[in-house]
């Protein structure tokens, strides 16, 4: 599911030609992407409209952080990752369009990257735990199968020896 979410984000945002794109064009793309993800995967993407309409164009960094925190409160790790990717892409592209000082949003982008790494770490840790748990269980199953086969073989060998009288 995570890869499909990220694909949806990148499809909507990377198909836009920055040189020909106005702020409104980009925000329309973001709106379409939010609609698509909202219909398909998540409930809280409508809160990203608040970020778009009120905060990104006015560069209100505090509100962007607060709204993002609210939007991600109940989201699964994969939805968080897609949202963070989406917001980072939009902010970077708006910086390119407006030719603003990239340092203005560097703090937000750094925070997003750090949060992405935490989410990725959580997903990897969960997968590692599940894999280890599965391997332990399947390893335990293999041992019990081998023991059962050995006992059955030993009993069959004993019955065969008894039947032959040797």
From Swiss-Prot:
Entry GO CC: host cell membrane; host cell mitochondrion; membrane
Pfam families: M11L
Localization, UniProt: Host mitochondrion; Host membrane
Entry membrane topology: Single-pass membrane protein
Keyword rRNA-binding: no
Domain of life: Viruses
Full protein name: Apoptosis regulator M11L
Source organism per UniProt: Myxoma virus (strain Lausanne)
